[in-house]
C-alpha cells in the first residue's frame, strides 16, 4: 500500500524515462538483482551518478491487526509497473521491531483515489502522508547511508 497521497507527474515522467533508458542498455528496472549505478547530465552539464535498487516493500503491523505491505521506497516505480501490468521484483522487509514502524501509515484505500499532481504540493495546504508520530524523521529509513544519491529528485536523463 502506498503511504503517500499523491504522485508527482514530473517525477513519474523521470522514472519512465529512466526505465526506457535502462532498457536501451539491456537493463530492466523492474527485474533488478541488486542495484545499478547510472549517470545523468545535469542541466548545467555536470555528470552525477545515482544508485537504483528495487522498490522496498516493508511489512507493517497496524493497530487493527492488519499486516500492511507499505511501499517504503520506490512508489513512482511501483505505480509505473502497475500501469505496465508488470509485477516488479522488490526488496521485501519483514521482522522490523514494532518500536520502529515505517514513519507514515499506509493509505487505507491503497491506490484508489491517489492524486496525480503536476506540481509538488505545498506541505502547508496538502497532506502528503499521515505520519505516525510528531518527530517522524526519527523513524525514517536512510538508504543514503549505503547508496549514492537515492531518495531525492532525479535530474533529466542524459540521452
Give, region by region, the residue ranges found by the protein language model:
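Short alpha-helix boundary/capping and kink motifs at helix termini
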Residues: 1-70, 82-83, 94
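Basic- and aromatic-enriched surface patches that contact anionic nucleotides/nucleic acids
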Residues: 66-159
Amino acid at each position: 500500500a502506498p503511504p503517500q497521497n499523491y504522485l508527482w507527474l514530473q517525477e513519474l515522467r523521470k522514472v519512465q524515462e529512466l526505465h526506457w533508458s535502462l532498457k536501451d542498455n539491456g537493463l530492466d528496472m523492474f527485474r533488478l538483482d541488486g542495484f545499478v549505478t547510472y549517470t545523468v547530465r545535469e542541466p548545467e552539464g555536470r555528470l552525477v551518478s545515482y544508485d537504483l535498487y528495487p522498490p522496498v516493500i516493508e511489512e507493517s503491523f497496524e493497530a487493527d491487526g492488519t499486516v500492511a505491505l507499505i511501499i517504503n521506497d520506490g512508489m513512482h516505480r511501483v505505480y509505473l509497473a502497475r500501469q505496465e501490468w508488470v509485477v516488479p521484483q522488490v526488496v521485501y522487509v519483514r521482522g522490523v521491531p514494532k518500536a520502529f514502524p515505517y514513519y507514515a501509515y499506509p493509505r487505507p484505500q491503497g491506490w484508489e483515489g491517489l492524486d496525480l499532481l503536476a506540481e509538488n504540493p505545498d506541505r502547508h495546504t496538502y497532506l502528503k502522508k499521515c505520519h505516525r508520530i510528531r518527530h517522524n524523521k526519527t523513524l525514517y529509513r536512510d538508504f543514503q547511508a549505503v547508496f549514492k544519491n537515492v531518495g531525492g529528485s532525479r535530474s533529466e536523463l542524459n540521452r
